[in-house]
Amino acid sequence: MTRLLRLVGLLAAGVGLAWAVDRWLGGRQRPDDGETVPDPIRSTIEIGVPIEQVWVRLAEMERQPEWMHDLKWVRIQTPGPIGVGTRAEGLVRILGIGVGDPIEVTEFLPPHVYGISHDGLFRGSGVFRLEALDDGRTRVTCDETLIAPVLPNLLGLIQAPILGRIFQADLERLRDQLEIEAVTIPA
């Protein structure tokens, strides 16, 4: 019984410490609306195909799981062509946990900007920016912001390096798929 009480006490102290650290981290960032928002996680890559080809693949929501490793599926819920206001539901694995990810397209400027909001348990936003380079290549930059449902400041600090590697690997997978297709599929 004494061991159990010690364990409960340590657990309570750990939760209290995590809460205090989270509040302290949140106090360092004070946006206008009072909600703490972590810095975006930025990933960038250059792809050896023209911007139009990159855009077509990037904007095909239902094919995004082919290159986004932790995105298991996407179902579009809004009829018609994809554009601002299009809603979809996805299943994403965040740090190994399957989570529903309702999204809405917030920016859609072909072939340059594709932005979404995440409206599920993990809230936030993502914006892909495409830039045509002089040699027929395309630079893709992704800024992703995710806000955890509990201890958002502390978990944001912990998740940034992990998710940064995952998001960069996703862009590398997109690049590899597009560059292989450019070589193997005749124009």
Which residues does each PLM region occupy?
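A short, structured loop/turn motif at beta-sheet edges
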Residues: 51-52, 79-82, 106-111, 129-139, ...
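Hydrophobic pocket/interface hotspot
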Residues: 53-58, 64, 88-90, 105, ...
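Beta-strand/loop substructures that line and gate deep hydrophobic ligand-binding cavities in soluble
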Residues: 117-169, 174-176, 185-186
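Hydrophobic/aromatic beta-strand elements that line small-molecule binding cavities or substrate pockets
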Residues: 43, 76, 101-107, 125-132, ...
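Hydrophobic ligand-binding cavity/cleft-lining segments
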Residues: 3-6, 13-83, 173, 187
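Short beta-edge strand/loop motif at the mouth of beta-sheet-based domains
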Residues: 62-100, 106-113, 183-187
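Hydrophobic/basic alpha-helical segments enriched in Actinobacteria
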Residues: 40-47, 70-73, 96-97, 131-134, ...
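Intrinsic-disorder/low-complexity, polar/charged segments enriched in Ser/Thr/Lys/Arg/Asp/Glu/Gln
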Residues: 38-46, 87, 100, 113, ...
